[in-house]
């Protein structure tokens, strides 16, 4: 168990190996208008 992190491994990390991913908003919070409409519907 190493107490100190191995910085050599971090410095030699190849960022090109990382895959580019498209970030997609999945759970967007409803607007105040949407919340009010839902309250009115009940």
UniProtKB/Swiss-Prot annotation:
Keywords: Acetylation, Actin-binding, Cytoplasm, Cytoskeleton, Phosphoprotein. The keyword Phosphoprotein applies. It comes from the Eukaryota. One of its GO terms (biological process) is actin filament organization. The modification N6-acetyllysine is found at residues 4, 15, 39. Distributed in numerous types of tissues, including thymus, spleen, lung, liver and muscle. The modification Phosphothreonine is found at residues 21, 23, 34. The modification N-acetylalanine is found at residue 2. One of its GO terms (cellular component) is cytoplasm. Belongs to the thymosin beta family. This is Thymosin beta-10. It comes from Bos taurus (Bovine). The lineage of its organism: Eukaryota, Metazoa, Chordata, Craniata, Vertebrata. The gene is TMSB10.
């Amino acid at each position: 168990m190493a107490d100190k992190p191995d910085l050599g491994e971090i410095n030699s990390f190849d960022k090109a190996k990382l895959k580019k991913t498209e970030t997609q908003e999945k759970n967007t919070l409803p607007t105040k208008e949407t919340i009010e409409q839902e309250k009115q519907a009940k």
